[in-house]
């Protein structure tokens, strides 16, 4: 990324960051990185393949080359730079799904309500759309699929670090609570052939999970259950993973979810919260901006270690360990 020591230029680039975000979103939505996977192409050829206006697509591509996502060669040709490779659908840790989701109109509009959130403490998404994210998506299958694809992308990226940091071999049955379409559970079951798994999420989300588990070759060890974690979750397992779930909720609902899990788990069981942990002042940009994302969209928050302890206590759980898993922490909790 180009840097400049002039603070006026640096702040201007930060202010205009939304333009880069939207440009990446458009390129991801058009599948530009996949079209460049085999090598360089001209802007005209890419426009023909994407059904876009060639001179305008060229303007988008050269802007992306200026921030080192693409590289522009002679004759309006473009190839992927290392950052752009991350936008291919087929790379490990692909961010294509996340980029397609994050700039989509409904989500984008909700971020326009950040000022409202800061003034009132209220959820911007609800303010802008008149519905919470979950009911909004439940009635819009395309947007729901876009979100699930984004979550799958993030889950895949987190899986390797989680498996390296956490010994899943000690468990008999793992329930992935709010596990989306099953990317994380599939990775855990693949790494541990002796393990049984249960994927639990909203019925319309897990509807797509059977085929996913089949493709991953773990369907004989993965049970799929639809429901709401405010009512009940599958009983009797010795590990309950919740990745990026409690950060969607405020403390009242967070305690409700954890209490449901606590009620269901085996006496010797544990809960593994896979979440960003808020760092001390001036550190940890990713968690602190993710916290704003939680404020704006689902209405939740990222938490410090102490805030996780305060959330777990009323649910009858206590922190046994906090394990570093790269961008995330694993907060391992057991019954009191
Ligand atoms: C931020 S996503 C994380 C998904 C997945 N754990 C991951 O890491 O990719 C939160 C998940 O919670 C699920 N969820 C939301 N409300 C739910 C409810 N009441 N009961 C069960 N799952 C719910 C959503 O469908 C979504 O899959």
What are these model-derived regions, one by one?
Residues 317-336:
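Core SAM-dependent methyltransferase catalytic element
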Residues 270-315, 319-321:
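C-terminal alpha-helical "lid/dimerization" subdomain adjacent to the S-adenosyl-L-methionine
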Residues 69, 193, 317:
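Short phosphate-binding/catalytic loops that engage adenosine nucleotides
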Residues 2, 8-42, 48-49, 54-172:
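Conserved Class I S-adenosyl-L-methionine-dependent methyltransferase catalytic core
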Residues 93-283, 329-330, 336:
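Conserved adenosyl
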Residues 77-79, 278, 325-327:
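Conserved beta-strand edge residues that scaffold enzyme active sites
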């Amino acid at each position: 990324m180009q840097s400049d020591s002039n603070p006026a230029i640096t702040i201007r680039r930060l202010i205009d960051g939304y333009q880069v975000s939207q440009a990446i979103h458009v390129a991801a939505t058009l599948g530009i990185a996949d079209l460049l996977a085999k090598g360089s192409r001209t802007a005209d050829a890419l426009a023909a393949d994407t059904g876009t206006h060639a001179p305008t697509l060229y303007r988008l591509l050269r802007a992306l080359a200026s921030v080192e996502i693409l590289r522009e060669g002679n004759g309006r040709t473009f190839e992927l730079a290392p950052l752009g490779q991350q936008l291919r659908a087929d790379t490990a840790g692909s961010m294509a799904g996340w980029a397609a989701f994050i700039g989509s109109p409904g989500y984008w509009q909700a971020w326009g309500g950040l000022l409202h959130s800061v003034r009132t403490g209220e959820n911007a998404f609800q303010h802008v759309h008149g519905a919470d994210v979950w009911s909004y998506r439940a009635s819009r299958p395309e947007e729901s699929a876009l979100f699930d694809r984004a979550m799958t992308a993030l889950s895949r990226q987190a899986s390797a670090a989680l498996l390296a940091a956490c010994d899943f071999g000690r468990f008999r049955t793992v329930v992935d609570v709010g596990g989306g379409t099953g990317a994380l559970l599939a990775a855990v079951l693949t790494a541990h052939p002796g393990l049984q798994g249960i994927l639990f999420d909203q019925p319309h989300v897990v509807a797509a999970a059977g085929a996913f588990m089949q493709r991953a070759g773990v369907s004989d060890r993965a049970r799929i259950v639809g429901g709401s974690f405010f009512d009940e979750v599958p009983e009797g397992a010795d590990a309950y993973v919740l990745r990026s779930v409690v950060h969607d909720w405020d403390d009242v609902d967070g305690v409700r979810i954890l209490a449901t899990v606590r009620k269901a788990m085996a006496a010797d069981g544990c809960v593994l919260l896979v979440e960003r942990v808020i760092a001390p002042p001036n550190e940890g940009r990713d968690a602190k901006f993710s916290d704003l994302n939680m404020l704006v969209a689902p209405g939740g928050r990222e938490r410090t270690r102490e805030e996780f302890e305060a959330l777990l206590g009323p649910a009858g759980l206590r922190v046994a360990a906090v394990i570093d898993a790269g961008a995330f922490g694993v907060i391992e909790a057991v019954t009191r």
